[in-house]
């Protein structure tokens, strides 16, 4: 067994009370300062105490080189813009201003042969006059020999064989699923 400097048997598990370099923990050899640092330890937590703010850092209320936020300036009334749709709808006459109902604009991709809803007999008579005046004007230019022919030629009903690809996919007459959700299988069921 190892005997220490004082002649007693040393037990393996105890540290020596005095390390070989002395009691100092300073490994760089600088003289110890007895004055503690004025800064609080940055890892120390003081959640219940008063907050300590550094005194030498100036507080900024405005961003550097920027314009002030205007929070503390005198407030000016905000201009409210006029609503496009009044509270009661477009034909509402709450405020006494005459508002005329306008027809909704058609979407450019929608077909333009839809019939607009009209109120009263005026719209029906205008619609009939507009449809009847165009064929009569064309017939008057061509001559009186074409008056015996019908003014409107019925359009042929499209069939599966005369399908145009730009109108969408051809309707299917079978049960086969081409793109199933789990992926295409090599087994085919008929």
Curated annotation (Swiss-Prot):
Ranges where the record places region Disordered: 1-113, 127-190
Main location: cytoplasm
Name listed for the protein in its UniProt record: Jupiter microtubule associated homolog 2
Similarity comment text for this entry: Belongs to the JUPITER family.
Cited PANTHER family: GEO05313P1 (PTHR34930), JUPITER MICROTUBULE ASSOCIATED HOMOLOG 2 (PTHR34930:SF5)
Quaternary structure annotation from Swiss-Prot or TrEMBL: Monomer. Dimer. Interacts with TPCN1.
Alphabetical GO biological process terms: endocytosis involved in viral entry into host cell; regulation of calcium-mediated signaling
Phylogenetic placement of the source organism: Eukaryota, Metazoa, Chordata, Craniata, Vertebrata
Recorded coiled-coil stretches: none
PTM annotation (N6-acetyllysine): residues: 11
Gene name in the database record: Jpt2
